[in-house]
């Protein structure tokens, strides 16, 4: 995410996001809301506005990471900014590591995909190859 000016944010669509549904939603209705959380910080910032999708090579190239550019960049025209106090974050103990759920107590992504697709996708092989896929598609 980059601040372009007082009223514009730029959000790259990084490789691996694969959220084409978000892009379709923006084409149908450009209104957006963004919530910014910083680990360990209780306060949040909420921004509302409208978004447009840019595939301008000059803009996408300005977001290069490890030689790879995003496929598109959301150009968010900011209409309102809200500062949220820390009460909800503090009450939820969101950043308290002692309250975090143990990862092994939850189903893996492969298990969830296998369950949702009747075994057509996912499963142990999906989980086994996940680190390699992540490394290849993170940027």
Where does each model-flagged region fall?
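Binding-site signature for planar aromatic cofactors or substrates
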Residues: 1-139
């Amino acid at each position: 995410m980059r601040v372009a000016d007082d009223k514009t944010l730029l959000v790259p669509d990084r490789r691996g996001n694969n959220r084409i549904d978000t892009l379709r939603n923006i084409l149908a209705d450009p209104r957006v809301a963004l919530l910014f959380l910083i680990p360990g910080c209780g306060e949040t910032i909420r921004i509302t506005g409208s978004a447009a999708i840019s595939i301008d090579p000059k803009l996408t190239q300005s977001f290069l990471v490890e030689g790879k550019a995003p496929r598109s960049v959301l150009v968010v025209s900011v209409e309102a900014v809200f500062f949220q106090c820390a009460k909800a974050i503090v009450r939820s103990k969101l950043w308290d590591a002692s309250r975090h759920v143990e990862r092994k107590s939850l189903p893996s992504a492969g298990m969830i995909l296998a369950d949702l697709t009747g075994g057509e996708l996912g499963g142990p092989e999906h989980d086994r190859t996940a680190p390699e896929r992540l490394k290849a598609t993170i940027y």
